[in-house]
Swiss-Prot record:
Region (Disordered): 110-130, 143-165, 288-307, 334-369
Assembly: Interacts with human EIF4H, EIF4A1 and EIF4A2; interaction with eIF4AI and EIF4A2 presumably allows Vhs protein to associate with the eIF4F cap-binding complex.
Subcellular location: Virion
The protein's name: Virion host shutoff protein
Native species: Human herpesvirus 2 (strain HG52)
Entry keyword Nuclease: yes
GO biological process: symbiont-mediated degradation of host mRNA; symbiont-mediated suppression of host gene expression; symbiont-mediated suppression of host innate immune response
Top-level division of the source organism's lineage: Viruses
This protein's GO CC annotations: virion component
Length: 492
């Protein structure tokens, strides 16, 4: 899943940055967690180490490890589920649904040109309660003002714990969801949305700072992603780093790399990131340009470089944008600046040389040894929040100007998906206000008796169950109320 070749490209071109993600003292950093994606990655990693564990045992082992790291790093997870909290919802929105609906409507490319390019409106598009939201509210209750939560649902009848994508995968998804709810963690019931789309909604409504996933299609939706939280410095990819490296605006990025989305192009018909860039005759920045970019990033990591103004192609001259010409115009004159002197390496013992101000985002020593004044962390945090509020993606609809009129099934699928992404992340104008509706967040009351009942019911070996329960009580303390966490992180 994701953009084919994007992860390899990001690693090769040093776009995977390692950051501490340490918020000021007393703050929790909210992070959306694509639960299936993250747990899948952990289970694949650990199931060979513990061949005697069944699905529930290996799932709980991975869950305990993940929750312990969240606690250690002061991260506040908001878990996003696939197919609802009971794993029974049909997914009717998103990339896979758009592909299925389009291929059912059009059997040949000739039919595609006569079909409406608009996808069905997502639940976020309409301001009225949708069918998907109605389902969410029937299964759980959103917090009323002053309410601290609702009692989690009981274990219920014995039900399968979610179908694994491969027979060899030992991931009990429904079991994982029930344990998290019993422990009182915040979650999103994505209902008929894909988890990726719900994560993007949380990011663009300034609910979370990052999305924890390895799916690079979140980058196509303009999000910053965290790949792994278990390391000292957390590997992240920022969408704006990609835009600066490619020297293009977000609408260009969305229109160009939608061709690489694996869920939209079956039977290996997608293009790779390298193929798309090669067709555009894109060239990587020179070393001097990379050094200047690194210097600008360190000087002011909160400022976003203004994107170049582009002129639309004349009407009637061509139906597909000439990306070669556009990118050639954008990189023209980049080498007119004089060569920068090599950057001095930082002083490992004392920080940057020449008395430069130390930044908590710079990687100098292991994070547990970095001593940064809390006042500096607060100032950097406020700058980050101000930057996120200032750099809302308002120009996403311009991506449609860079797409050709759909003449084939593939182009129709891409056109519909781009429109769908725009409906997810672009705020709507309502008089003097710009609004983007956020999916409701739920947080059940913590019930340790219920959690113990769920664990002992599915893990029949008493010694294994007791060991995991002891880990949960030790490393997964009662989480804070999500509204308090979000208010402190974004508003103080």
């Amino acid at each position: 899943m994701g953009l084919f070749g994007m992860m390899k490209f990001a690693q090769t071109h040093h776009l995977v940055k390692r950051r501490g993600l340490r918020a000021p003292e007393g703050y929790f950093t909210p992070i959306a967690v694509d639960l299936w994606n993250v747990m899948y990655t952990l289970v694949v990693k650990y199931q060979r180490r513990y061949p005697s564990y069944d699905r529930e045992a290996i799932t709980l082992h991975c869950l305990c490890s993940m929750l312990r790291v969240f606690t250690q790093k002061s991260l506040f997870p908001i878990f996003v589920t696939d197919r609802g909290v009971e794993c029974t919802e049909p997914v009717v929105f998103g990339a896979k649904a758009i592909l299925a609906r389009t291929t059912a409507q059009c059997r040949t490319d000739e039919e595609a040109s006569d079909v409406d390019a608009s996808p069905p409106p997502s639940p976020i598009t309409d301001s009225r309660p949708s069918f998907a939201f109605s389902n969410m509210r029937r299964r759980g209750h959103a917090f009323a003002p002053g309410d601290r939560g609702t009692r989690a649902a009981g274990p219920g009848p014995a039900a399968p714990s979610g179908a694994p994508s491969k027979p060899a995968l030992r991931l009990a998804h429904l079991f994982c969801i029930r344990v998290l709810r019993a422990l009182g963690y915040a979650y999103i019931n994505s209902g008929q949305l894909e988890a990726d789309d719900a994560c993007a909604n949380l990011y663009h409504t300034n609910t979370v700072a990052y999305v924890h996933t390895t799916d690079t299609d979140l980058l196509l939706m303009g999000c910053d992603i965290v790949l792994d939280i278990s390391t000292g410095y957390i590997p992240t990819i920022h969408c704006r780093d990609l835009l600066q490296y490619f020297k293009m605006s977000y609408p260009q990025f969305l229109a160009l790399f939608v061709r690489c989305h694996t869920d939209l192009h079956p039977n290996n018909t997608y293009a790779s990131v390298e193929d798309v860039l090669r067709e555009c005759h894109w060239t990587a920045p020179s070393r001097s340009q990379a050094r200047r970019a690194a210097r600008r990033e360190r000087a002011n990591s909160r400022s976003l470089e203004s994107m170049p103004t582009l002129t639309a192609a004349p009407v009637g001259l061509e139906t597909r944008i000439s990306w070669t010409e556009i990118l050639a115009q954008q990189i023209a004159g980049e080498d007119d600046y004089e060569e920068d002197p090599p950057l001095q390496p930082p002083d490992v013992a004392g920080g940057p040389r020449d008395g430069a101000r130390s930044s908590s985002s710079e990687i100098l020593t292991p994070p547990e040894l970095v001593q940064v004044p809390n006042a500096q962390r607060v100032a950097e945090h406020r700058g980050y929040v101000a930057g996120r509020r200032r750099h809302v993606i308002h120009d996403a609809p311009e991506a449609l100007d860079w797409l050709p009129d759909p003449m084939t099934i593939a182009e129709l699928v891409e056109h519909r998906y781009v429109k769908y992404v725009i409906s997810l992340i672009s705020p709507k104008e309502r008089g003097p206000w710009t609004l983007l509706k956020r999916l409701p967040i739920y947080q059940d009351l913590r019930d340790e008796d219920l959690a113990r009942s769920i664990v002992t019911r599915h893990i029949t070996a008493p010694d294994i169950a007791d060991r995991f329960l002891a880990q949960l009580w030790a490393h997964a303390p009662p989480p804070a109320f999500y509204k308090d966490v979000l208010a402190k992180f974004w508003d103080e």
